Amino acid sequence: MLKDEIKTQEQFEKGFAEFKKKYPEYKDAKPIERLNLIMRKEFAMQILKGEKKMEFRAFSEHYCNRLVDKDTSNFMNKYFGTEHEDEVFFYANYVRPVKVIHFHNYSNSWHLDVECERNDFVTLTDGDVKFLNEEYGCHELDDMLNDFNKRKEENRPLFFYFSCGKVIDTNLQL
């Protein structure tokens, strides 16, 4: 089953199970138990107060080295440019799922540990920003998107995103 044929979560799960049978060498990206991220205290306080639900990081070499599963990426690259490319790139995801994010400053004088509900990457396009708006109520990229659209920029940046869940531990005070 491909993207155009899938309308429900059940259909996706069935298609994904078929995909895994067809490609037994495929392995899900290895999860990251705890991801350390440097953050300014004001943003950590916004998360603690429930005002900020999303965190973004540039799709840079630094974060790709930390967040991209090399084995899954190699599997996907094997099918790049083949007749199986669409199917493989639809089901396979090389972004390593993060379980907990440990936000802190450079000196580690404070920390904020939060559950990561979901992480992946987005492109600064109308569709991806609309997804963030509707799925998470996140409007942090709206102004940047409008600026790129006004300038008719074709090369759009990518970002890793993290949906922040419940606070697990912190030494910050409200």
Which role does the model predict for each range below?
Residues L2-L174:
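Structured alpha/beta reader/binder surfaces that contact nucleic acids or chromatin modification marks
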